[in-house]
Amino acid sequence: MRTNPTTSRPGVSTIEEKSTGRIDQIIGPVLDVTFPPGKLPYIYNALVVQSIDTANKQINVTCEVQQLLGNNRVRAVAMSATDGLMRGMEVIDTGAPLSVPVGGATLGRIFNVLGEPVDNLGPVDSSATFPIHRSAPAFIELDTKLSIFETGIKVVDLLAPYRRGGKIGLFGGAGVGKTVLIMELINNIAKAHGGVSVFGGVGERTREGNDLYMEMKESGVINEKNIEESKVALVYGQMNEPPGARMRVGLTALTMAEYFRDVNKQDVLLFIDNIFRFVQAGSEVSALLGRMPSAVGYQPTLSTEMGSLQERIASTKKGSITSIQAVYVPADDLTDPAPATTFAHLDATTVLSRGLASKGIYPAVDPLDSTSTMLQPRIVGNEHYETAQRVKETLQRYKELQDIIAILGLDELSEEDRLTVARARKIERFLSQPFFVAEVFTGSAGKYVGLAETIRGFQLILSGELDGLPEQAFYLVGNIDEASTKAITLEEENKSKK
């Protein structure tokens, strides 16, 4: 039987001592509960319904108080299915908000919104729990220094660098390498920063969540034989779960990440897939609670709910939480209130391109569409900024010339444009990189490339020093020295074929 951290953690008085109420009304996932006078629970308190249904099966439903209605009644939203509940059933006020296990014991495990393990690996050996509703760090605790969060991925570090303690939007459809990019980031932060990661699956497909778990085990991000050596904790609230669970699962994942930042003083990577589903679940709950909808049917508290989640993701003097959030854009409408509210919080955007993926260039990050507020001379320095701008200019010129090349051919271009195209094609291939987590699939050893090495490599291509090397030499290599070595190998192979 699963142990609920909210009701079983140390310091929580036994259920018999708590105030009890009765279910008055059930409308889908929303319960109205009547309590004795003077015994009303607070907003966000967890309520538990423990009973037997008509089929003689055990019911254990946790709810969260959302409204105080008057006449000793409260309205709560269920975190699991309300099947089998009946009016008149007893409801226990736990006297505290939902609390979840935190710390090293959560690594390598899968949890639901209540912090209960759902991976059949037994209970979690963690005495520490945190409530999921917490305040954002105080102004005095925030680290205001703007610093780059080095990922070891060339295209990200050079053209759309991440901010330490920042928020990044990850835009990508199915099959363009989003999962592999996520796993590589989890792997690299563990190796380069000694950090850990938390993955929050908010309203995602159960199949995708299972696939991610299996791929993480295959690539070593989750160490099945020695679970303590795993680098990530997973928290899932899938599409089939009630809106209350999908609305709160992001906070559960964030709470686990906050412990690593505040207590263990680590750099944490927090993935939220998908932030749109968080908004969507909030919209459903808002309608169920009877609030008047706002623009496009969204909840009137959209900005407040988004802000309360996003403001907790910050860099403090103890450590940092850097968040990468997958953003679904409904009907590709960027003015839709859900993505528009999300954009206001983002420091960088990483756009994955199907066109690049079809060319076999991985990671398929679009170098022209991806942006970052960190790419400024005063933050990254003149050398980095100028190199990035020249790379973008070269790629942009190549993009403009592609139509002419398709119609008239490469020979019709001027000498200068032919040189630009040759360098752009080398740059495009040099932006690809072998990943550690893809070693088992590709047979190529993964590469972590430091920022200084990345800048040096692109400067050499732009300066024309490597014009004599074939473009294949730049494909799927780490630093620029490997490209030179690969060119020699390719030349020897060609000679031996002749």
From Swiss-Prot:
Topology versus the membrane: Peripheral membrane protein
EC number(s) stated in the UniProt entry for this protein: 7.1.2.2
Enzyme class (EC, first level): translocase
UniProt binding sites for ATP: G172, G173, A174, G175, V176, G177, K178, T179
GO molecular function: ATP binding; ATP hydrolysis activity; proton-transporting ATP synthase activity, rotational mechanism
Subcellular location: Plastid, Chloroplast thylakoid membrane
GO-annotated cellular components: chloroplast thylakoid membrane; mitochondrion; proton-transporting ATP synthase complex
Catalytic activity as recorded in UniProt: ATP + H2O + 4 H(+)(in) = ADP + phosphate + 5 H(+)(out)
Keywords, sorted A to Z: ATP synthesis, ATP-binding, CF(1), Chloroplast, Hydrogen ion transport, Ion transport, Membrane, Nucleotide-binding, Plastid, Thylakoid, Translocase, Transport
GO BP: proton motive force-driven mitochondrial ATP synthesis
InterPro entries membership: AAA+_ATPase, ATP-synt_VA_C, ATP_synth_F1_bsu, ATPase_a/bsu_AS, ATPase_alpha/beta_chains, ATPase_F1/V1/A1_a/bsu_N, ATPase_F1/V1/A1_a/bsu_N_sf, ATPase_F1/V1/A1_a/bsu_nucl-bd
Similarity remark: Belongs to the ATPase alpha/beta chains family.
Physiological role: Produces ATP from ADP in the presence of a proton gradient across the membrane. The catalytic sites are hosted primarily by the beta subunits.
Record text on subunit structure and interactions: F-type ATPases have 2 components, CF(1) - the catalytic core - and CF(0) - the membrane proton channel. CF(1) has five subunits: alpha(3), beta(3), gamma(1), delta(1), epsilon(1). CF(0) has four main subunits: a(1), b(1), b'(1) and c(9-12).
Protein name as it appears in the record: ATP synthase subunit beta, chloroplastic
Species, as recorded: Lolium perenne
